[in-house]
Regions:
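Active-site-proximal region of nucleotide-activated glycan assembly enzymes
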Residues: 1-35
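Generic beta-strand/beta-sheet core signal
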Residues: 1-2, 53, 82-84, 112-114, ...
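Short, conserved active-site loop motifs that form the nucleotide-linked donor/cofactor pocket
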Residues: 18, 108-110, 172-173
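Conserved catalytic-core segment of nucleotide-activated headgroup transferases in glycan assembly
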Residues: 23-115, 122
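Catalytic binding pocket for nucleotide-activated donors in carbohydrate/polymer assembly enzymes
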Residues: 122-126, 130-215
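Acidic, amphipathic alpha-helical patches
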Residues: 116-117, 162
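C-terminal amphipathic helix plus adjacent low-complexity
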Residues: 54-56, 69-72, 82-84, 89-97, ...
Length: 223
């Protein structure tokens, strides 16, 4: 583990003693042949697209209520939810209805499944992490395609995976500690398209230069 995933003082939550690596508990190598990072879609479309590759098991009412608040605060924005679970019509309909119950028209939602994920991510401006259980590999895939995300740091360790990734990347400013702050940080990212375009253009290089993709360094840390 690492200090962001298992902060000092949380030892009582574990049955074993946490062994903290000095930089990151994660190291990433993209699978297959990822697409090149494209220009920010919102610059051409005129609206922000949020997106997540999470599985349905991570969705919950508290989480989608926060996402509904986010969509309400960013006019015209849309949400893409892409995972194999949502290839089932009954699962798609369940979550479409839950968003509608929160005041979000289904026309603003694209829930389904396409693979490989790289093409989906090329159409998204900002990635969404889940809580109280954070996403995992899909956060790294999103960053690799130039998409920033905000995480809500919760209970170690499944609630602090996003914080670990962002700390290793060098963007702790995208870590939130309350639901209000989570939404506020996402709104701030969505409200500055020139800055968001710069983030997208440089994020893959930042990631490649970080501990998240330093495989030899990770091996040395473990040794």
């Amino acid at each position: 583990t690492d200090a962001a995933t298992a902060p000092a003082g949380c030892e009582a939550l574990f049955s074993e003693t946490p062994w903290r690596l000095p930089r990151s508990a994660f190291v990433y190598r993209p699978l297959g042949q990822p697409d090149a990072v494209n220009a920010l879609p919102a610059l051409e479309r005129g609206y922000i697209t949020f997106g997540t590759l999470t599985r349905a098991i991570r969705l919950n009412q508290r989480l989608i209520a926060a996402w509904a608040r986010l969509l309400q605060r960013v006019p015209g924005s849309r949400l893409v939810i892409n995972s194999h679970n949502f290839s089932q019509p009954e699962v798609r309909e369940l979550w479409l209805q839950r968003f509608e119950d929160l005041g979000i028209a289904r026309e603003r939602l694209e829930i389904g499944f396409q693979s490989p994920v790289w093409g989906v991510l090329r159409g998204v401006d900002i990635a969404l992490d889940c809580f109280p259980q954070n996403s995992g590999t899909t956060l790294l895939e999103s960053l690799y395609m130039g998409l920033p995300f905000v995480t809500l740091a919760g209970t170690p360790s499944m609630g602090t995976l996003g914080a670990s990734v962002l700390t290793a990347l060098g963007h702790p400013e995208w870590i939130a500690h309350s639901e209000d702050e989570y939404v506020d940080k996402l709104v701030a990212l969505a409200s500055d398209l020139p800055a968001l375009a710069r983030i997208r253009a440089g994020l893959r290089s930042e990631m490649q230069a970080s501990a998240l993709m330093d495989e030899p360094g990770f091996a040395r840390d473990v040794e």
